[in-house]
Amino acid sequence: MHPKAANPKEFLESKWKHAFTTFFDLDQNGLIEWKDFKDLIEVIGEVRGRRSDFFMTARLCLPDIWQKMTEAIGKEEEDIITLSDWIQLCQSSRKSVREPAWQKAYVEYMFKLLDESGDHLVDQAEYVQVLGYFGVNRKDSSHCFDQFAFNHQGQLINSIDKKKFHVLWKQFFHSEDPSSPGNWLLGKV
C-alpha cells in the first residue's frame, strides 16, 4: 500500500502533481512552458549526445507532445499550462474512453527514453539513470523500481517490457487504488 493513500481523490491528484513538478515543470516555476520541453531536449543532448537516437527522438517527439497537450486543453502553443490546467487535463484523460493523443505520445516517448539499450525492456539501471535526469535520487528510484517490477507470481524481475510499462503508466495516471504497482512508476510520490 502506498503511504500517501488517505483520500483516493487526493491521492490521485498527488500523483498528477508529482508528474507535473518532476517531469514537466523542469525550471520549477509552477508552470509548464515550451521552455521546459526545450530544456529537456538540451539535457538529453548533453547526457546522451547530440548525435544519439535519444536526442533525435526528443527533438522530434517533444514538440509533438507539447502541441497535443496544449491542444487538448484549448491553449495556443505559446501559452503556459498551470497546475490547475494539468489537473483538468489528467481528469479528462482519466474519463476518456480512448487514450488522449498527448498521453499516448508521451508514454511512447518515455518508454524509448527509459530503454537506453534499445532492447525493448526497461531494466533497473536504465530506470534509475533516467529518473536521475529529473532529479530523482538513486535510492528512491531503486526502491520504486522494486515496487512495480515483479511477475505474475509476485517475484521481482530485472526488467519490464513495453506492455507492462503501459499497464503501470495507466495505473499511475488513473488508479485510486493505493496498492497499484503503477503508483511507483514515476518515482516516489
UniProtKB/Swiss-Prot annotation:
Ca(2+) 1 binds at D25, D27, N29, D36. It comes from the Eukaryota. Ca(2+) 2 binds at D115, S117, D119, E126. One of its GO terms (molecular function) is calcium ion binding. Residues 11-47, 102-137 form the EF-hand domain. The keyword Calcium applies. Keywords: Calcium, Metal-binding, Repeat. Transmembrane segments: none annotated. This is Calexcitin-2.
